[in-house]
Amino acid sequence: MPHANWGSSTHQVAEGIDMPMYCNAMYLESESSKNKLVILDFDLCSMSEEIDSMVRDSVMSILDISKESIRICLSHTHAGPPYGKDNLNGAGWITEGVELINPYYDSFPEKISNAVMKAVRSAVNCNVSY
């Protein structure tokens, strides 16, 4: 994957995986099941509106939830890809590994749906107070 957000990098494409990039999914639901919330925490620096919509649509396709009830958080890592499918050259300086970007983002709907379903299936009762 091209390191699109790492200005001091001496290379454009990763030679291997030092630390994997994750998306952690958390599912919260009220006792009545009326209120639902999904929190997704991505190892990305930024996210385009197209990818944001793709992620929310994939969650809404498997869960009765509004897009406003899906919170997307980003770790702000600079070791990741460009921010979207429309920025394949990283603002002009990426010349290697461009062919890896779209397949990476195209894998999001299935992977995110699987992560959310795993979170839903592993939900346990708890009390939240403050």
Task: Indicate residue ranges for each PLM-predicted region.
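Conserved beta-alpha junction segments in alpha/beta enzyme cores
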Residues: 1-73, 77-130
